[in-house]
Structure formats: structure tokens, C-alpha cells
Design a protein with these regions (language model features):
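Short, well-ordered, mixed-charge alpha-helical segments that flank or form enzyme active sites
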Residues: 18-19, 101-102, 137, 165-168
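Active-site-proximal alpha-helical scaffold in enzymes
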Residues: 56-59, 63-66, 139-151
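Flexible, low-complexity linker and terminal segments
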Residues: 2-4, 141, 146-260
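Thiamine diphosphate
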Residues: 1-120, 125-126, 131-132
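Active-site/ligand-binding-proximal alpha/beta "capping" segment
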Residues: 125-147
Length: 260
């Protein structure tokens, strides 16, 4: 995650996800390469609801952000996942699977949560679910997850499992130079009448960040117009739903076929 430009991660301790965050805490400042310093802030929150809320809030400031959890914690994140979806906020949720349901077998391996990740949250909104098969895939897939979150302005759920989380393996040396960073339509300046949710042919609007001059925007959990103001107008509702769903076409085009 540090190599991929992640600058904020929140978590609430849960097996088997905690190992990742604890490792990141130990290496919050790590020289990745000559032009890329790690410097990632890790925050342990009071619960999983706070964890995803802080990750989404960090993303609003323009930094790459993530949170990490397992099945029971992801259940608690579902509502804020939808909030990120309707507000088109990029965030990466790393879901380390274990055996369920409920507490299940908290220290045992499981791969039960694919459909849950695909369908979590009420209503319809686009998201990307990436499932990695081994440690090496996990490294490079993480870069894809952050890029796709930024490019399409959607939540990305990266599915791993206890085996990947807890294993010590011998593999090829990771190559940070193969990790590219694409921030998508993140603005560095905004002029005139800025519309955070402006209609566009690909469904992806220019994205401001908190504190950007002339880039004021509004976020609520309600349907909104192009500026972000609450709207219950049925025509606007259809337009906004269509706008968000347009991203699916773009995702299917850009995500490599071998990954689908």
C-alpha cells in the first residue's frame, strides 16, 4: 500500500486483518524508492464504522486512503460503503476473509465473502471487487485497486484471506517500478462554477478535494444535483443513477480481461 501511494489507513483490530495494519504501523515512514517516501498514517479506531468513515474522510482531502477488516467488520461498514458509492468517493477496503458466519472460526481460513463483497450495501452503485490468489498477486493487485478507485471514483474491495495474511512465503523480489500511480480526474485547481457531480460522457466528474480554492462541493447521503445539493426531482434521480452506472462500461473496458 505504501508503494501504491496510500497515505492513510484506518482499522479496528480483527483477525486476520490486523497483521497488515500492525506491519504498516511499524513502518509508517519507509523509503520505498529514491523518489517515493512511504510516510503513511495508520489510525486504530474504536470500531469498524469509524474505520471506514475515517478512510472515506481522508479520501475527501485528496489522499489515497484505505481501511482493512474481516467479515464481521465488513458487515458494519456496509452503510458507509453506500455513502462512498453515492458520493463517488474512491476508497480501498481490504477484506481479509475468514470462516463465518457471525464469529465463525475467527482464527481459521475461509473464502466465504465474494458474493457479500459484490452485493454489500443497499441500493445500486458501482464498485470493483478484486480477489488476489497469492502474495505476489496481492502486491501488484493493490496498485490496480488504488488506481481504479481514483480513476473511476468508486469504492474498491480487495479480497484476500487468512492464508495470505498470516503466511511467510518465498517469492520473487517485488518490483516497485512496476507500480504506476494514476490519480484520475483529481483536480489541483478549480475555476468558475465547479460542479462536483457534473454530467460527463463517461460518468466520471472532475474531483475536487477539501480546501481547494473554488472547488467547493457538498456531500450528503441523499441523492443530489450536480453541485451536491439534495434533490428529489425524479428526472435528476434518473440522470444521476445513469451517470454512476456509466462507470461500469468504463470499468469493463479498462480493467484487463484476464482480471475479470
Amino acid at each position: 500500500k505504501m508503494v501504491c501511494g496510500c497515505r492513510f489507513q484506518s482499522y479496528y483490530p480483527i483477525t486476520p486483518a490486523s497483521d497488515e495494519s500492525e506491519f504498516l504501523e511499524t513502518h509508517e515512514i519507509l523509503q520505498i524508492k529514491e523518489d517515493r517516501l512511504g510516510s503513511t498514517t495508520i489510525v486504530q479506531t474504536e470500531d469498524e464504522i469509524s474505520a471506514i468513515g475515517m478512510a472515506v474522510g481522508a479520501s475527501l482531502t485528496g489522499v489515497r486512503s484505505a481501511t482493512s477488516t474481516s467479515g464481521p467488520g465488513f458487515s458494519l461498514m456496509a452503510e458507509t460503503l453506500g455513502w462512498a458509492g453515492i458520493n463517488e468517493i474512491p476508497v480501498v477496503i481490504t477484506l481479509f476473509q475468514r470462516s463465518g458466519p457471525s464469529t465463525g472460526l475467527p482464527t481459521r481460513h475461509g473464502q466465504d465473502d465474494l458474493l457479500f463483497a459484490i452485493n454489500a450495501g443497499h441500493g445500486e452503485f458501482p464498485r470493483i471487487v478484486y480477489a488476489s490468489g497469492d502474495v505476489e498477486d496481492s502486491f501488484y493487485d493493490t496498485g490496480k485497486c488504488f488506481n481504479f478507485a481514483d480513476i473511476f471514483q468508486v469504492p474498491v474491495i480487495h479480497i484476500l484471506d487468512k492464508f495470505i495474511a498470516s503466511s511467510v512465503v518465498t517469492c520473487k523480489r517485488f518490483e516497485p517500478d512496476l507500480i504506476s500511480i494514476d490519480r484520475g480526474k483529481l483536480l489541483e485547481k478549480a475555476d468558475g462554477d465547479y460542479k462536483r457531480f457534473a454530467h460527463s460522457p463517461d460518468g466520471i466528474s472532475p474531483r475536487s478535494k477539501l480546501g481547494l480554492e473554488n472547488g467547493v462541493f457538498w456531500n450528503t447521503g441523499d441523492e443530489s444535483d450536480e453541485h451536491g445539493h439534495i434533490s428529489e426531482d425524479p428526472v435528476n434521480r434518473i440522470q444521476m443513477m445513469d451517470k454512476r452506472q456509466k462507470k461500469v462500461e468504463q470499468i469493463l473496458t479498462l480493467v484487463p480481461k484476464n482480471d475479470q
